[in-house]
Amino acid sequence: MAATVAVENLNPKVLKCEYAVRGEIVIHAQHLQQQLQTQPGSLPFDEILYCNIGNPQSLGQQPVTFFREVLALCDHPCLLEKEETKSLFSADAISRAKQILSTIPGRATGAYSHSQGIKGLRDAIAAGIASRDGFPANADDIFVTDGASPGVHMMMQLLIRNEKDGILCPIPQYPLYSASIALHGGTLVPYYLDEKTGWGLEISDLKKQLEDARSKGIDVRALVVINPGNPTGQVLAEDNQCDIVRFCKNEGLVLLADEVYQENIYVDDKKFNSFKKIARSVGYGEDDLPLVSFQSVSKGYYGECGKRGGYMEITGFSAPVREQIYKIASVNLCSNITGQILASLVMNPPKVGDESYAAYKAEKDGILQSLARRAKALEDAFNNLEGISCNKAEGAMYLFPQIHLPKKAIEAAKAANKAPDAFYALRLLESTGIVVVPGSGFGQVPGTWHIRCTILPQEDKIPAVITRFKAFHEAFMAEYRD
């Protein structure tokens, strides 16, 4: 009897879904890593450098001490009863852990919580949002999630009814959006960021793409904006954000604001403004604009990817719609408690006067300043190579250089049945051990080719990354020169 489950009879939405950040090149890199372990010296490099994903601690970034102290005490509350704890943990970490545990029934961090998250932790997150924006925030609007990704999936599940429902997404975009739209059976409506203007977002292009989609019978439900940008690293100007908010209001679109890199700003002339702050600043009240803001503990200076913490703040939805969002959250029971605690800490870190403040600020500033230096070093290195142009990384954790490939390289890629930038990235991996993501995994203007490279290798390894990359690129260009 034939197998009852085969690729041919799987859900076509799953087959359509792609996620390049952990795709073919990363799988090949993992095989090469195994080869290095079992056959040392068998490859032209001695380690794999994963520049494909925003996973800071996997590349050596250290966690923030205060956050980990509080998590340790919350996970093992009996430590709070021991006298020696006072000499091992800071006083404010001890008091914060006690305060957090007082909001958790039975101090049981291993128990399920309310489906939106523990109320006291949502109160803390709301207080952090209010402090950041200068406008009130309500714990009832907060849904704590296992990172930002489940929140995105929940909103796609809510908004997409069939393939005639569209979501406006930036190109290039983080593949979570194309993947989740495909999984839920919707249509991605692309709008292109302008590489020539530093990955600018033009309202005129948004209008054009919206009108074009509607003319084809697509009911465009929402606009996704990633700020700071992934994979492009730009930080939106405040006036641009005002135009985006007005556009969504005028066109009846839900604004899905991916703001997980809000702490990652590397230029003095830009700063992060949440879309909620912008909406309130232009005069839109609580009920005037449906807005979902996503935040995560995985990025910023904290980089706690494996803890799976995050939240979405939902405003501007009617009570009946909010009930449906809550129902989706309830199906998933709740997010993990460690991630919930960490989300509350990220939004309420130590303040001036707290015992941990000086050490916390030194850790935070050290990480962000180092990331800025790494971004500049890689940007300069890319721009000094033949056939590569790279915009400034204003924020986030990535550079997205354009690779101007020779015609012979494009023909060789076609013969290998690869996208040209995937062909380049695969050769880069096999020659140097450096893992990057082809731009074709994020979307790009047809006829252009890019790679996404994180700025996350530790600062003392950046010179080696640059040296390896330069040697490879020069040899590649010489091999395929027209």
Swiss-Prot record:
GO terms for biological process: biosynthetic process; L-alanine catabolic process. Transmembrane segments: none annotated. It comes from the Eukaryota. Induction: By light. It is an enzyme of class 2 (transferase). One of its GO terms (molecular function) is pyridoxal phosphate binding. The keyword Aminoacyl-tRNA synthetase does not apply. Pathway: Photosynthesis; C4 acid pathway; Amino-acid degradation; L-alanine degradation via transaminase pathway; pyruvate from L-alanine: step 1/1. It catalyses: L-alanine + 2-oxoglutarate = pyruvate + L-glutamate. Its EC number is 2.6.1.2. SUPFAM superfamilies: PLP-dependent transferases. The keyword Zinc does not apply. Pfam families: Aminotran_1_2. InterPro entries: ALAT1/2-like (IPR045088), Aminotransferase_I/II_large (IPR004839), PyrdxlP-dep_Trfase (IPR015424), PyrdxlP-dep_Trfase_major (IPR015421), PyrdxlP-dep_Trfase_small (IPR015422). Mesophyll and bundle sheath cells. The modification N6-(pyridoxal phosphate)lysine is found at residue 299. The N-terminus is blocked. Its cofactor is pyridoxal 5'-phosphate. Belongs to the class-I pyridoxal-phosphate-dependent aminotransferase family. Alanine aminotransferase subfamily. Homodimer. Transfer of C3 units between the cytosol of mesophyll and bundle sheath cells to maintain a nitrogen-carbon balance in the C4-dicarboxylic pathway. This is Alanine aminotransferase 2. It comes from Panicum miliaceum (Proso millet).
